[in-house]
Amino acid sequence: VELEIGCRFDHVSDVAVPAVAIVEPHSSVRDAILEARWEGDTAEQYEDADGNSCRRLVLPAGASSFSYSATIRVSPEPDEVPCAEETQHLIEDLPSDLLHWLLPSRFCDSDRLADRAWELFGSAPRGVDAVQAVCDWIHDNIAYGVPTVPTTNASEVLAQHGGMCRDFAHLGVTFCRALGIPARYVSGYLPDIGVPKDEFDDFHAWFETWLGARWWTFDARFNVPRIGRVPIGRGR
C-alpha cells in the first residue's frame, strides 16, 4: 500500500533558534520511501545513535516554517502479534546491547514505579501476556485526551490517571522495564486505515518490547493491531 505522510511546523521567535527536526521515517524503513520532499531552510542531515533520521537547522528570528512530506510503501496487514512462544528472557541472558533499554530515563522513571508495576502485573505470566496486561491496564485506567506538558513523566501520568498518546507509551515502557522487559518509545505516523477517523490529527506514539529474538509493537492507546504504522523516532 502506498501512503502519503507529512507535517508542517510554523515557528515564531525573537531570536534565531538552533533546532533538530525528527519528522522523517526511521532509517529502518528508509528503503520503503518512494519519494520525499523537504521545504524550508537548508538543513544538515544525519542519523543519530538510535537510527533516527535528523535534520539540523537554525530557525531564523521572526516567522518561519518547514514541512516534510513523502510517499512510502507500507504493509496492508495489521501489526504482527507475538505468539506465546516469544519468551521474555532472564536479564542475565539478554544480549548486552539491550541492557540500556531496561534502565530508567527522563520520561520513563521505572525505578520509581517498580513497586507499582509488580503490584499490578507481578502475578501475570511472563513475556507476551505480561506486556499485554500492561497495555490492557493502561487502556482501561488512563483517560485519553487529558492535557499534559512536554516534561510530564510516567509517574505524573499515573498520578493524574490521564494523558496523551506519548504518555500512554511512556507508561507502557516504564512498567515493562520495571518488570525486566526491554522496552523503547516510538513516535511516528499512523493513518486511519480500516478504522474511524481519529479526532486528534497529529503524530502518534506507541512502544516496542524485546521478546524472543526481536522487537514487537504494542499500543496502549488503541490496544488493537493497526495498519500502516510509519516509525519516525525510537528512543529511551
Where are these regions (language model features)?
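Hydrophobic/aromatic-rich core segments of domains that either
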Residues: 136, 167-236
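A broad, low-specificity signal for short, low-complexity segments enriched in glycine/proline
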Residues: 26-35, 144-147, 166-171
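Secondary-structure boundary elements
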Residues: 13, 76, 82, 92-163, ...
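Generic structural "secondary-structure junction" signal
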Residues: 5, 59-61, 74, 109, ...
